[in-house]
Regions:
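Exposed, flexible binding/inhibitory loops of compact, secreted disulfide-stabilized domains
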Residues: 20-180
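Sec-dependent N-terminal signal peptides of Gram-positive bacterial secreted proteins and lipoproteins
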Residues: 1-24
Length: 180
């Protein structure tokens, strides 16, 4: 009986240790395209390589060709990703749709990464490492085995609100985790 109680106590202690880890020590939250945070104009003015963008008229409507199809433009000289470190409301207001996010820049910072993707899955933060002004973000999405959810190429973004750090440079790596 003492052995059984010892094993149960050990398992409880092990679960407690694992559960108390501070996986999100910077209180980071990631938002994606589905949250409709960034404006179309901001995305159009910060193109990503391999992505087609609809062309707008001055009145905000989309241009069409003689066949009625939307005119698109692709910038193959654009970078494959873009990263923005936002430290004030003035900069943020040029990027976001109004009332989509609230950021307290006294205690928080925003990091945005635009990238090319075939998928529109939700994104999750695996880890954030910060050293000497450099932040390294590991981001993942989830897919089900055998589930086909790809789409046409499009620009995606990871919009991260987190504790204020003195970030000068940010790098991102993306992976997919397969779930059952």
């Amino acid at each position: 009986m003492k052995k059984i109680m010892g094993v149960i106590l050990f398992i409880c202690f092990a679960v407690l240790l694992v559960g108390c880890g501070n996986k999100n020590k910077y209180h980071a939250t990631v938002y994606t395209n589905s949250n409709d945070i960034l404006t179309e104009d901001f995305l159009f003015n910060n193109k990503i390589k391999k992505v087609e963008y609809n062309v707008k008229n001055e009145d905000g409507t989309y241009q069409k060709d003689e066949n009625g199809n939307y005119k698109t433009v692709m910038d193959n000289d654009a970078p494959e990703e873009r990263t923005f470190i936002v430290k004030d409301n003035t900069t943020l207001s040029t990027m976001v749709n109004s009332n989509k996010v609230t950021v307290d820049f006294e205690t928080q910072i925003v990091v945005v990464n635009l990238f090319f993707s075939y998928f529109s899955r939700d994104l999750f933060i695996s880890s954030i490492k910060f050293k000497d002004g450099n932040a390294k973000f590991k981001i993942y999405d989830k897919t089900k085995r055998g589930y086909k959810d790809s789409s046409g190429p499009h620009a995606r973004y990871a919009f991260i609100i987190m504790d204020k750090l003195d970030i000068e440079e940010a790098t991102f790596s993306y992976t997919t985790k397969e779930v059952w």
